[in-house]
């Protein structure tokens, strides 16, 4: 993961921890349990919305390194040659398919972001970022989000790309203290998908008209 993109003011650094980092930063050895929780985004991992979006775009394109740019208008064209991040794309395909299933199968955590139009299938994954350590009392009380003090509520996350067969868009959503990613962030993503589809159709019609006029 890139530490910074340097395209926004006050952008924070990201962190994907490893054994060397922990030894240098904390003076302690890495333990197996940290490998397990790191795999699901817990532990010492730190990330920003732009980093999540960039990660999602690189999953969508099959694992090629890309750099975000702010485009002022539709006339700006970039023809960068992207560098592969990985030698094999098999694992990328597994992640792509899993994100598609999460969004388009009824039992998927991202199903609330699914569009009904079969022409536009997106692939996404929800996330819930824990804010406060869960105590034994918390487990016994089993409080709902609205019963928890606002500043202690989890952050709701969602990332996605699409359309699935020919990806053009990637997005990331973080709702601070929003609660569950599937309950809060995924429905918001659906509204964004609708806006993307509308814009996509408008642009497609514009391009077709432009070519007809030539």
Language-model regions: role of each:
Residues 3-172, 213-214:
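Beta-lactam-recognizing serine transpeptidase/beta-lactamase-like catalytic domain environment
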Residues 48-54, 184-191:
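Short amphipathic alpha-helical face segments that pack within enzyme cores
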Residues 64-65, 183-186, 195-200:
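Glycine-rich loops and low-complexity Gly/Arg-rich segments
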Residues 76-81, 190-214:
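Short, gly/Ser/Thr-rich active-site loops of penicillin-recognizing serine hydrolases
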Residues 179-180:
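Short beta-strands and strand-coil junctions in structured, solvent-facing domains, enriched
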């Amino acid at each position: 993961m890139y530490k910074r993109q340097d395209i926004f003011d006050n952008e924070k650094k990201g962190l994907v921890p490893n054994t060397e980092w922990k030894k240098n930063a904390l003076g302690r050895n890495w333990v197996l349990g940290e490998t397990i929780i790191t795999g699901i985004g817990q532990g010492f991992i730190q990330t920003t919305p732009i980093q999540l979006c960039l990660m999602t775009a690189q999953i969508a394109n099959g694992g090629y390194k890309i750099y975000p740019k702010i485009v002022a208008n539709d006339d700006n064209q970039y023809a960068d040659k992207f560098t592969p991040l990985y030698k094999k794309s098999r694992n990328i395909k597994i992640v792509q398919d899993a994100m598609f299933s999460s969004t388009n199968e009824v039992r998927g955590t991202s199903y609330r972001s699914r569009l009904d139009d079969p022409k536009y299938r997106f692939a996404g994954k929800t996330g819930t970022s824990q804010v406060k350590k869960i105590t034994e009392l918390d487990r016994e009380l089993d409080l709902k989000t609205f019963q928890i003090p606002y500043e202690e509520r989890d952050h709701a996350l969602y990332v996605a790309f699409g359309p699935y067969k020919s990806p053009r868009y990637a997005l990331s959503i973080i709702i601070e203290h929003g609660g569950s990613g599937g309950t809060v962030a995924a429905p918001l993503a659906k509204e964004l998908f609708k806006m993307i589809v509308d814009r996509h159709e408008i642009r497609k019609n514009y391009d077709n008209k432009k070519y007809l006029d030539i």
